[in-house]
């Protein structure tokens, strides 16, 4: 007699009744400590924003089943099979509204279905419910959501079926079906070859998972590098055969000659990071970069990670070109576990500053079904992060030592990454401090040790080469240099350098201070003789400008062609920048100094001009100095243009006379 079995869960007594359609054979006793009805709504709610992850779980299980069979054959515990080609096939049946995942792996017996699909899954439900009962979607925080396994299929399915046949000799096929509540049915199946087929009857609200483009997108996201071939809706395709001239070749009977094209897998089972670095070419590295990140700008260089001890870690990190020089363009570091995609940019594993790079890291030893807070405090995880950081710094040192010219070429692209790393990681700063470069206004690159400093260890810097062009010209005329620090991260970085080198470095913006090298050497007698002229000039500017917050200073500058410059102290500027970043106003933002150049012919002529012309010249000199310091307001610009017109009128009248 053939017996068809049906099992029912969750009776009030806690017992498990096994019924036969024709005769009741036995009664199995067992305690189910969790109501399985509660499990599936929580799964669906917990992973609401990541529903597509179900396909990764199902396909991963298929790959595991293939790997188990392959391992058993390798040790002689399973019979060999000629022509066996391990593969996973994903099929969409739009009419039946089914998504089907099938493998030719180890398969399961009826006992194994009960043990692995039912008992194991449901017995793990208590821990699952306890862990996530109180957690919202935002705070769930499980890395990669691994561990849901087979039951993740219920996130998108009204019912799920299993057709399976074990590799074991004499095994019978098994069919299992459940609607994800408190019961399931199990009976003889129809499968004829070893392996497992998961049939997901997609629910009405999840019909997007019956679109081939959507499934292909998910497979490309999660399964792009899984270790066994994966096919989506595979079928042989008949294509015409063309000759060398591009014409379709003909058969003897005059019909078009065709050929059968076999389907191609959607994944790459041997990703580049698994190869030894010595076996990889530059072309392969570049092609892999373009394939994974769809970035057709060539990377600057890359680091191939290949570690077997004390932990298993493989991967490739690329340094991309930064197309936006003012801002850091975020990178993308993909984390894998045994070639299965987990997530992008997990800063608990990959140091935050490395996320400016692009790359892949495969770490089978990483615990992925734990919380982010656990990862933050896990010693092994911290060792992995530190190792990755060390490998990056070693590579940069290698390029600096052996390819200094290339390192300088790369600097504009990698400087933001290095500076950010130094700010975030003190050990990284200690490794990198000797190869940090400063670019000068003359286009040279110097380390901090090589950079020419003043007697007071001052380093002048530029934040805008166009706006500060007048100051740059003054420096160049006098044989001085300044560092070009135009990136948004630079203010924070120079503060770090000053903190790390309190007695050796002091950064001053080029318009914050006038060093002695910019001034004319004068004897004490000459200085005293010029004091009266200086007082007269200051009184004149004070009278006509009428700005009580403005400070005045007269200096003899070597740049004779410059009538005046504006200075704002480095301290005042930094406070100003800080308060602006906090959205507050800085009371001292107008406390600037107008430095009047007593060597300039126009300035020297001011005391001899008529009163009305004195005001015009003083205001115009101030506007010119302010323009070189910062943009004028709309009102200031309007007044500046009006004075320009008046000056032109005076010149034309003078010419006509």
Which role fits each region the language model picked out?
Residues 8-10, 15-210, 217, 224, ...:
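GHKL (Bergerat-fold) ATPase N-terminal catalytic module, capturing the glycine-rich phosphate-binding loop
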Residues 142, 160-183, 203-207, 213-657:
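GHKL/Bergerat-fold ATPase module in large chromosome/replication-associated machines
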